[in-house]
Amino acid sequence: MSVQENTLPQQLWPWIFRSQKDLAKSALSGAPGGPAGYLRRASVAQLTQELGTAFFQQQQLPAAMADTFLEHLCLLDIDSQPVAARSTSIIATIGPASRSVDRLKEMIKAGMNIARLNFSHGSHEYHAESIANIREATESFATSPLSYRPVAIALDTKGPEIRTGVLQGGPESEVEIVKGSQVLVTVDPKFQTRGDAKTVWVDYHNITRVVAVGGRIYIDDGLISLVVQKIGPEGLVTEVEHGGILGSRKGVNLPNTEVDLPGLSEQDLLDLRFGVQHNVDIIFASFVRKASDVLAVRDALGPEGQNIKIISKIENHEGVKKFDEILEVSDGIMVARGDLGIEIPAEKVFLAQKMMIGRCNLAGKPVVCATQMLESMITKARPTRAETSDVANAVLDGADCIMLSGETAKGSFPVEAVMMQHAIAREAEAAVYHRQLFEELRRAAPLSRDPTEVTAIGAVEASFKCCAAAIIVLTKTGRSAQLLSQYRPRAAVIAVTRSAQAARQVHLSRGVFPLLYREPPEAIWADDVDRRVQFGIESGKLRGFLRVGDLVIVVTGWRPGSGYTNIMRVLSVS
């Protein structure tokens, strides 16, 4: 808020509906301390009574209307209520702790939007059963069309990874790798099942060609660190920098090294075919290093999987450096901080996270923030303070989705972890500096002749100017909803669609609440449009987005089919 007394900041007026301007002036200008003082003291109830419900149903309003980012921070209020409806989607990994139908129902109630299946573990039979359970749990809510919650299913590929061999004592044995000792890293087949404390076999045959003297080799998520001293005919002679206990089949990372592994392994191809056969909605493509890796996944999905969204996981230095070309051919990005924190220095991970989220926001593509978000909740009922801040800052950075891994796959508190992410996200979303965010996104938007894109940015701007409580969009493929999400409206985007897959996939986009409309089309198309819009309004009222008297922006097409969105209306909820 401006510190001038008895004047309302000019930048505030675009946020206040024209018919409310005179009322706002009379309510604020005569207050002690002027408008700024009034807004700092007034309760939400007072503001709601004087300026209308829709404008003030979102919280942290004084901070959201601040003139500068520093002032925005100063005006954040810990006693302000969180937003009514969470906009950031929650991805939960499904595993032994969460794959039962009853537990999945609890997680859906708690706020899970996307169920992730990690194909680094488990057989196809195991994952087929998990998919069946997820769908059964989801459909158990279908008795009420207005409260039905579509849940997307994501397949996370194993990806092109490097692993050690089996130790001499068998798959369950372990050996101690002692700091300062010498270890031979070899590709000689005779050591594939005969590893020990002095010799470690790896399954990457070109390792001697790509790793230089002085380079590092990390084993088992970086717990063991080796420094290359010499490259010989038998392999790499290394010195142990950090020792530890080594088991069989552990992951190997080669930081700052461009490896020439194929983008897809044979197992990945089988897994992708499985995903197409079981109608998964999203592919999380692991260890993407360049654009051609993404195109290989698209080719593997084939015509039957052409509508599956591909989210590229950035987990290595090469992927970060080639981020723009990867983003261009991907449907979205996952900031996979686990392996990324091994491949690049841990203190630089936050830089990579902010860079990738920012570029995704500018490109209008979904971005997921993942790994160790609430790691302590694997064994504890409450997260650490640092973890809650990490989740909140991912939301403030602009992530569309936040992900839980071991917390829900194997943890003791999977439902509580989802509930905690839900609560943190609601608080963080209220603290977003929407005014600055929309202005920057609008300025950065290139000129466009695409009617759908132009209509989307106009609808978001109109939602700010008339203080709309929601934007209702009728969509066939979900593209219109994603374009609206791109400009980050404060209003909820209620996406009404007849496509079950589109309803599930729009969870990737922030602030979009999908509604699956199951009624058959009306004979007269205009009547069908009105019925779907009314369905969106009734659902919004049921979920608390809308109240009688609120304004909503309605975005529709001028004819049936996809690609014809170009009509925007303003309606009052009755």
Curated annotation (Swiss-Prot):
UniProt GO molecular function: ATP binding; kinase activity; magnesium ion binding; monosaccharide binding; potassium ion binding; pyruvate kinase activity
Keyword Electron transport: no
Residue positions where Phosphoserine is found in the record: 2, 19, 26, 43, 292
Means of activity regulation: Allosterically activated by fructose 1,6-bisphosphate.
Record-level GO BP terms: cellular response to epinephrine stimulus; cellular response to insulin stimulus; glycolytic process; pyruvate biosynthetic process; response to ATP; response to cAMP; response to glucose; response to hypoxia
Annotated substrate binding sites: 116, 313, 338-339, 371
Binding-site list for ATP: 118-121, 163, 250
Sites annotated Transition state stabilizer: 313
Any Pfam family matching the protein: PK_C
Reaction(s) the record says it catalyses: pyruvate + ATP = phosphoenolpyruvate + ADP + H(+)
Cofactor entry: Mg(2+); Mn(2+); K(+)
CDD domains with a match to the protein in the record: Pyruvate_Kinase (cd00288)
Keywords: Allosteric enzyme, ATP-binding, Glycolysis, Kinase, Magnesium, Manganese, Metal-binding, Nucleotide-binding, Phosphoprotein, Potassium, Pyruvate, Transferase
EC number: 2.7.1.40
Role according to the record: Pyruvate kinase that catalyzes the conversion of phosphoenolpyruvate to pyruvate with the synthesis of ATP, and which plays a key role in glycolysis.
Subunit structure: Homotetramer.
PANTHER family found in the cross-reference section: PYRUVATE KINASE
Something else known: There are 4 isozymes of pyruvate kinase in mammals: L, R, M1 and M2. L type is major isozyme in the liver, R is found in red cells, M1 is the main form in muscle, heart and brain, and M2 is found in early fetal tissues.
Protein name: Pyruvate kinase PKLR
Gene: Pklr
